[in-house]
Regions:
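N-terminal, polar/charged subdomain of small-to-medium soluble alpha/beta proteins
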Residues: 1-113
Length: 113
């Protein structure tokens, strides 16, 4: 899986390694479905502190479209983990929903007599 990293934060090199490792780990079972992930970090209100670290994860999936999830937290790691966990749950839900539609579509075909 290809991980693209965008950030305007000062300690971006540490965050880049962390984001790539965490994204590959969280999506390890869905790599056949998610070929590319984009992780973007932004500090909403600058160096003032508070719950303002935003992580946006955009996943391009094969056949299900793209998934974009944003999480805001007090620190970068929590924001990254929150966004990745929500994104993986959403991709899994979309995959199951798509499989259900295909199964119902096959059952809807009338039998010939």
């Amino acid at each position: 899986m290809q991980v693209i990293f965008n950030s305007r934060v000062g300690d971006a090199s540490d965050l880049r390694d962390l984001a790539a490792r965490r994204a590959r780990f969280v999506m390890r079972r869905l790599t056949w479905l998610v070929p590319r992930a984009t992780v973007q970090f932004t500090d909403v209100n600058g160096p003032r502190g508070g719950v303002d670290k935003r992580c946006q994860v955009a996943l391009r999936t094969d056949g299900l479209g793209s998934v974009v999830v944003t999480a805001v937290a007090r620190d970068w790691r929590s924001a990254l983990d929150g966004a990745l966990s929500r994104a993986s749950r959403l991709v899994l839900r979309l995959c199951r929903r798509d499989q259900g539609r295909r199964e119902r579509g096959q059952r809807a075909i009338p039998l010939e007599r």
